[in-house]
Structures are given as C-alpha cells and as structure tokens.
Amino acid sequence: MTKTLPKDFIFGGATAAYQAEGATHTDGKGPVAWDKYLEDNYWYTAEPASDFYNRYPVDLKLSEEFGVNGIRISIAWSRIFPTGKGEVNPKGVEYYHNLFAECHKRHVEPFVTLHHFDTPEALHSDGDFLNRENIEHFVNYAEFCFKEFSEVNYWTTFNEIGPIGDGQYLVGKFPPGIQYDLAKVFQSHHNMMVSHARAVKLFKDSGYSGEIGVVHALPTKYPFDANNPDDVRAAELEDIIHNKFILDATYLGKYSDKTMEGVNHILEVNGGELDLREEDFAALDAAKDLNDFLGINYYMSDWMQAFDGETEIIHNGKGEKGSSKYQIKGVGRRKAPVDVPKTDWDWIIFPQGLYDQIMRVKADYPNYKKIYITENGLGYKDEFVDNTVYDDGRIDYVKKHLEVISDAISDGANVKGYFMWSLMDVFSWSNGYEKRYGLFYVDFETQERYPKKSAYWYKKVAETQVIE
C-alpha cells in the first residue's frame, strides 16, 4: 500500500556551516579547531567545501525548483564572534542576514542551528564544553543571535551533542582527538545540555518569537540476542551513552535512577567521575517543558553483544567495508546480524530503527511536543555520468525511511518534517569529499551543481506527499 505524509509536512535539505561554506578565514571569520586538525590529521581540508558562502543563491534557487521547502543552516559561531566572545564581526552578521533573506525570497524556511561541531578555536583550546566558562560564552552568543536575527523562526541550540562528546573523547576522530575517556564524554554531554537549557530558558523568558529545540543523533540500540540478558544489558548501556543520558536531560530535567546506575557502572569500570551541580539541575529542570521540538538525526542502528575485554574502536573513514571495530570495556561490542545491509562505511541500514526511536521518544518523553527528522540520508561514492548521478540506492534508502515516518505518524507520533542530509554534496568530517550525500552533485573543482536522480524523485514526493 502506498504511504503518504501530511499536507503541511516539511521536505527539507540539511547543511552545516563548516561542511558547506568554505571561506574559512574570509571576512573576519575566526579559526576553529578543525582548521589545523584537518591539516595535521586528514587528507583534506574544509576549503572550498561546497563554497556555500558564495553559492548559496544557486543552492536556494535549486531548492525552490526541486520542492525543498526547508533548509537546515548553521551559523558559524566564529563568523559572529571570531574568538567566541567579545568583539562582534559585522561582516559575519551581514552574511547571515543576506543568507536568511535569500531563503525567504525562495520560500525555503531556514531552521538555524547555533552550534554544529565548530566551537571557535580560542574556546576549544581552553577545554571546549568541559570548561564551564564556555557555557556562559555560548549563552551570550545565543542571546546575540536571538536578538539580531529576528527573521529566523526556528532555532536549534546544538547539533548532535552525543557525537560531539563521542568524536572528541571516545572515538577520538574530532579535535582534540582523545580516545576512550568515558568521563569526559558524559561531562561534555552534560555541560552542553546545561548550555542548551539555559539558552532555551533565555529565549522563552525574553519573549522572542519563533520556536526553539535541539537536534540529537539517536541511533537505535538492540541486543544481538534478545534472549540473552547480558546482550540486553550491553544494549541498555550503549543506549545510555548515546541516547538516554541526553534525552533525560532534555525532557526530564534530570537523569533517571536507571540512567545514573548505568553511568556509574560505566565510570566504575573505566575510571573518572562527573561534576554534576545543583544549579545544573535547576537549569535543566527549568527548560524541560520549554522545547518546542526535537530534531532527530537518524542514519543507522546498532546491535550490541556482551563482551569482556578492553576498549578498542577503529573508525572506518575511507569506505573500506568491514574495517570498523567498536567495543567498550564494561559495556559491550557492536555485532550486526549477517542479514542486515551495511554501507561501505559500515553504517547499518535499518529503517525500522527510526520508527522504534520515534515511538520510544513518544512513550518515554511525552512532553516532546513535536519531532522533525533533521538528518537522514545515504553516503555513497557517487558515480557522475551524463551530468547526473543515478542514485537508486539513495532513493530506496530515503523512501524506506519516509515510509516508517508515515507509519509513526499513523501510530500517533507528531512528526512535522524531514530534512535529507544533505542538500548538496558537502565534505564529511572524518571521511572527506569521497563520501557524498547530496540531492545535488557538486563538482568540487568547478563548484557546479547537478541534480541527481534522487532530486527529481524527492521533488515529486514533496509535491504530492505520496511516497512512491
């Protein structure tokens, strides 16, 4: 049976400042930790990325032509405050005003994120969000943006608090490249959630118009053997690290006893302790019912198996299928069922996981109000033929995920939109330019855009709300 989506559903495309803009030192932009980190550790940099800094009129015109009526954009904090605080950079402010004006001219609603992995270098090298002073700096930056950019109707504080802590302190593929420090992971999650809560409270107390929420990456975690209590426990602990800890902070304003039991177990095994203060919980509690929406980024699920051994994580950054490894001491290891498909980067394709995650939020956090799927898509080594890409695999992936969103809506979940990652090809943080996600193919040499087969398919779905 053909499935449909509501008439007012947003069919969006997603971008991020650092992955799309290029112009990393242009017009007064301050440095971010990624600038040097990519030069030192990877085979690519963020120049020119998709040159969105100059080419956004082209991308927004294409959006309008292809039925994309929402766009996720992030503001580069260091374009506004080059050192994260103090002096404002007027050229950065002007750029975003021009960008948002173009969005509205093209009838593409901007959903604007304040922080998408790109803390200014001056603050990042001072501990990033492990340093509590940076909570204040973030709230001040947020307040400036709320006041300045009154044309924005949808704000999100952070993109993917979970993967930031994960990338910086567990996997070690984000600057500062620390591995296996679970205490830092949880502390980063916590301090960023306090920053989020304080920004949301300020937004509401100040009476700004528009809506505000947060974007969480929520990969669903399953036990490898649902009948084995040890595998069930491994999945629960992995879920706490990546999902439950930050969801509790968002919607309960505290960490449930079950969540803290898991956190304490993980830290007991791996070492370290957390600094959780009364004023933190006051801030979390004050904001827990003020979020207008939750953004869910969903790409994959994981299966967890009980495991007794040391932590070892190997990141597959080059698309060499089967080269990744993930096992955490006292938690478990990832082991997927053989019949579940994977991408070349070992990302597990499992649309049912998105349905399960949406329904979990609905059941466990009934004050969620509404959900946008703020990222979902398929990374490929696209083959450019006849000025396009025949990306049937991507179409199939997105179709199946839209279908489970339709199912979730039918089953009572309030899901209001979908943003495909990514609008146009951008560079991938730890995979470079080879891993493409866009509706529009970007020739990174010439910066020309070419609609892929998926763009024509997406346009039809957006126009008809029929998933076929």
From Swiss-Prot:
Gene Ontology MF: a single term? beta-glucosidase activity
Q: In which pathway does it act?
A: Carbohydrate metabolism; lactose degradation; D-galactose 6-phosphate and beta-D-glucose from lactose 6-phosphate: step 1/1
Reaction catalyzed = a 6-phospho-beta-D-galactoside + H2O = D-galactose 6-phosphate + an alcohol
InterPro entries found in the cross-reference section: 6P-beta-galactosidase (IPR005928), Glyco_hydro_1 (IPR001360), Glyco_hydro_1_AS (IPR018120), Glyco_hydro_1_N_CS (IPR033132), Glycoside_hydrolase_SF (IPR017853)
Where D-galactose 6-phosphate binds, per the record, is at Q19, H116, N159, E160, N297, S428, W429, K435, Y437
Q: Which GO terms describe its biological process?
A: lactose catabolic process via tagatose-6-phosphate
The record ties this protein, via SUPFAM superfamilies, to: (Trans)glycosidases
Q: Is RNA-binding set as a keyword in this record?
A: no
Q: Which residues form the active site?
A: E160, E375
Question: What is the similarity comment for this entry?
Answer: Belongs to the glycosyl hydrolase 1 family.
Which protein are we looking at?
6-phospho-beta-galactosidase
Q: Which organism is this protein's natural source?
A: Streptococcus pyogenes serotype M28 (strain MGAS6180)
- Please state the gene responsible for encoding this protein: lacG
